[in-house]
């Protein structure tokens, strides 16, 4: 083994910095509780330049000592011990308790090559896929066109019970201890290399390549497929919220979504004309069913593929369409794609040298991002469209299309077999070929950056950026994105897998995640690994109606409630009429969602102004309860304990629910209080799902309205769920602009004293245009309710 020569560069301006030459390692205190570790085998420490991190180094007081083989760095929160002989690093808390070990001699590097696939042009043909029309060719050979370095590093943490994060994946994992996860961008994978532990730390790996995570129960190994430098951040955090706070310090704050996003969004594949969209909205309004946004999916273009131009035959005036939607008090989202083909837009990008391999625009070029925005602006933004659906932001896949027959193990599986490692290899190869191995996972981050920065740069912009997208990376939370989990198939098994997928994604510090309620594919063909829907009759099948309702109940308690999919329509009247069980169950959930918009919007502000996460795996709140560490089908949504029903009633008319210990729980539907730390059996009636509120919670609600803006000025009910002292802050602003960044918002603190049965409504802080100076609050407890007029001054209400 090679012993590294130790060179102490400096401990200056309070920043601890140590480096070692050939290979070279650097340890850098970013804050007293965040440490950056970089290692390279070639004597240099080049930046990976992912664009993920935007922090400013704090001036950290660090003491350096040496003890034989060890070099020791100590801040007010951490002690770092580095071994000169074996590259081991020990991370300790301020009381000298070991949090994490970078295992000695685990740093490894080996050559990594970037290949260009050479295709047989004579075999080229166009196929329809779930991602649109694609040109498919047979592979002749692979040529090496670039080189990088593959890195390995391993860690151990004593008695580690749970690991979470790494993005949204469909392997049916929550707790990642003992698991292997293949990380790349994909239709059904949103990779984000942030790992969180209940042992009080997080790790952010800052490299733009594909990765592999493996934990054997005691040792975690990360494999980075191609990077200039192994670069990771150690984040100390006593609880998961503290780890999230560290992640957001490094990568940026969460954008505050507009208020309307917390209403209901209706989508499907697809509305075929302006009239189709307008008539659908009119039907919602006729039925008085709340809705805030409707979505135009793909194939609105007149020619080619992905052309940001509406076909005048079916969409004669984009502005008239947007105006009509707005006249119905709704917002309009449109699907845009990064891969224009066979159209003037594609030729324009090619002529400007702004296209990468596989006909995706060069998102890493700022001028190309600006040019892409010019198309989106001219056809949509300038015409009044409100929100973006940046589809296919991976932006390529290698396992969604037909695979050449000579590479198949099974000729009956023309799209390959459902093997995670095999599919990871296919996808990382095609992404590396087009984007480069060192940035194969970064496309969505830069695509989102382009939409966000260019919209915000528009003169007179009054709309918050909303970007529904399918891929992600660290730092994307600052660009107004909501990630959804891709083109899922409708089966109860798939439903169950989706819940932990979202919880792990949101545990990374990126809180906005959603699904296609009802799942994308309802049909299946038995041949394609992804096309496995089990309800070919769609809404005609009562079994699918039940499935849809159960997913809708779950989606009600996600940051964005959105119905979408292929094969069958999704509007509420497709599931029955008023008075029938499925229609009424859907309407009940929509109404419940709208009642709670004051609560949801306040939670959103907590996310944007701090470390909070709205939808939370149970270890956020109850890390000491071992029963919840791998609880895949329950989670917290604010102070709600949400327990989706994930099997048909014919299999079971009840649903077992675990109530975490450390709290009492109040049944939302009945008001009955239960002690925590036990399992109970709940009825799984189609009209509801098991839903509990933590005793000691304040939940503000308001009257149901047909759209979120119509609720402004309505009385707000302050619901007290007693059992413990608690507080909450109601947040309000103008709802859909960035004036809140300049201080244009108001907050109203609420404090409940449980022993005294007293609520204190504190003095309102701040103001904004349109703020209600006088308003009605209804304070509701199990002992009764009181109606008060609030004028911004401290008010005490005793029961």
Sequence positions of predicted segments:
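Catalytic core of carbohydrate-active enzymes
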Residues: 452-460, 464-465, 472-482, 505-515, ...
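Extended Gly/Ser/Thr-rich low-complexity repeat segments
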Residues: 31, 45-56, 81-95, 104, ...
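Catalytic and substrate-binding clefts that recognize carbohydrates or anionic sugar/phosphate headgroups
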Residues: 66-258, 268-270, 274, 281-286, ...
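Aromatic- and carboxylate-enriched substrate-binding clefts and catalytic-loop regions
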Residues: 101, 290-586, 621-622, 637
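Conserved, mostly hydrophobic/aromatic
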Residues: 27, 194, 284, 325, ...
């Amino acid at each position: 083994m090679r012993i590294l020569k130790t060179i102490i560069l400096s401990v200056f301006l309070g920043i601890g910095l140590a480096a070692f030459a050939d290979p070279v390692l650097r340890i850098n205190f970013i804050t007293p509780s965040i440490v950056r570790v970089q290692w390279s085998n070639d004597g240099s420490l080049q930046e990976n330049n992912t664009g993920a991190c935007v922090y400013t180094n704090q001036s950290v007081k660090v003491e350096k000592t040496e003890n034989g083989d060890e070099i020791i760095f100590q801040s007010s929160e951490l002690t770092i011990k580095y071994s000169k002989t074996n590259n081991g690093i020990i991370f300790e808390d301020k009381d000298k308790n070991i949090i994490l070990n970078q295992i000695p001699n685990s740093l490894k590097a080996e050559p990594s090559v970037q290949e260009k696939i050479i295709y047989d042009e004579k075999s080229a043909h166009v196929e329809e896929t779930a991602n649109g029309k694609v040109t498919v060719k047979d592979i002749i050979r692979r040529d090496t066109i670039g080189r990088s370095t593959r890195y390995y590093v391993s860690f151990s943490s004593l008695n580690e019970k749970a690991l979470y994060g790494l993005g949204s994946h469909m392997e049916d994992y929550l707790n990642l201890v003992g698991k292997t996860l293949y990380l790349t961008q994909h239709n059904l994978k949103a990779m984000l290399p942030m790992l969180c532990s209940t042992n009080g730390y997080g790790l952010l790996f800052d490299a733009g390549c594909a990765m592999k995570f493996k934990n054997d129960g005691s040792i975690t190994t990360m494999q980075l497929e191609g990077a200039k430098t192994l670069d990771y951040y150690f984040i100390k955090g006593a609880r998961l919220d503290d780890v999230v706070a560290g992640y957001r310090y490094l990568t940026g704050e969460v954008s505050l979504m507009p208020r309307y996003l917390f209403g209901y969004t209706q989508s499907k594949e697809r509305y075929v004309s302006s009239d189709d969209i307008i008539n659908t909205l009119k039907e919602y309004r006729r039925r008085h069913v709340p809705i805030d946004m409707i979505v135009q999916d793909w194939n609105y273009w007149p020619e080619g593929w992905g052309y940001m131009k509406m076909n005048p035959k079916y969409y004669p005036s984009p502005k008239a369409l947007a105006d009509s939607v707005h006249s119905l008090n709704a917002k309009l989202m449109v699907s845009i794609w990064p891969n224009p083909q066979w159209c003037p837009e594609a030729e324009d990008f090619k002529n400007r040298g702004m296209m990468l391999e596989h006909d995706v625009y060069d998102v890493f070029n700022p001028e190309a991002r600006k040019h892409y925005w010019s198309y989106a602006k001219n056809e949509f933004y300038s015409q009044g469209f409100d929100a973006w659906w940046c589809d296919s932001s991976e932006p390529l896949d290698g396992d969604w299309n037909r695979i050449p027959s000579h590479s198949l193990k099974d000729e009956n599986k023309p799209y390959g077999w459902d093997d995670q490692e095999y599919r990871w290899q296919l996808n990382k190869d095609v992404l590396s070929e087009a984007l480069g191995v060192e940035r194969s996972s970064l496309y969505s981050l830069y695509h989102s950056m382009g939409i966000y920065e260019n919209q915000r740069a528009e003169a007179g912009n009054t709309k918050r950026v909303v970007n529904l997208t399918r891929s992600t990376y660290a730092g994307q939370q600052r660009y107004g994105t909501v990630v959804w989990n891709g083109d899922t198939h409708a089966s109860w098994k798939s439903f169950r897998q989706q819940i932990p997928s979202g919880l792990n994604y949101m545990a990374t510090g990126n809180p906005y995640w959603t699904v296609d309620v009802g799942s994308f594919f309802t049909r299946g063909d038995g041949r394609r690994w992804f096309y496995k829907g089990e309800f070919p009759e769609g809404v005609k099948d009562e079994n699918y109606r039940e499935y849809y309702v159960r997913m809708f109940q779950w989606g009600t308690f996600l940051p964005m409630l959105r119905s979408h999919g292929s094969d069958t329509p999704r509007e509420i009247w497709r599931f029955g009429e008023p008075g029938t069980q499925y229609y009424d169950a859907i309407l009940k959930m929509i109404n419940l969602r709208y009642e709670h918009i004051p609560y949801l919007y306040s939670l959103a502000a907590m996310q944007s102004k701090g470390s909070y996460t709205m939808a939370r795996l149970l270890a956020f709140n109850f890390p000491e309860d071992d029963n919840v560490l791998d609880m895949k089908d329950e989670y917290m949504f604010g102070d709600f304990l949400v327990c989706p029903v994930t099997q048909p009633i014919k299999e079971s008319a009840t649903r077992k629910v675990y109530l975490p210990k450390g709290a009492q729980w109040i049944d939302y539907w009945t008001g009955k209080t239960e002690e925590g730390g036990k399992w109970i059996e709940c009825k799984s009636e189609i009209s509801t799902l098991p839903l509990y509120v933590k005793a000691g919670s304040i939940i503000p609600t308001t009257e149901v309205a047909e759209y979120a803006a119509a609720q402004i000025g309505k009385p707000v009910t302050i619901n007290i769920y007693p059992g413990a002292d608690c507080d909450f802050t109601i947040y309000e602003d103008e709802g859909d602009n960035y004036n809140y960044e300049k201080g244009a918002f108001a907050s109203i603190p609420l404090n409940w004293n449980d022993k005294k049965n007293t609520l204190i409504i504190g003095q309102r802080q701040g103001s904004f245009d349109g703020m209600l100076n006088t308003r009605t609050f209804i304070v509701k407890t199990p002992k009764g309710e009181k109606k008060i007029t609030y004028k911004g001054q401290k008010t005490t209400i005793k029961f």
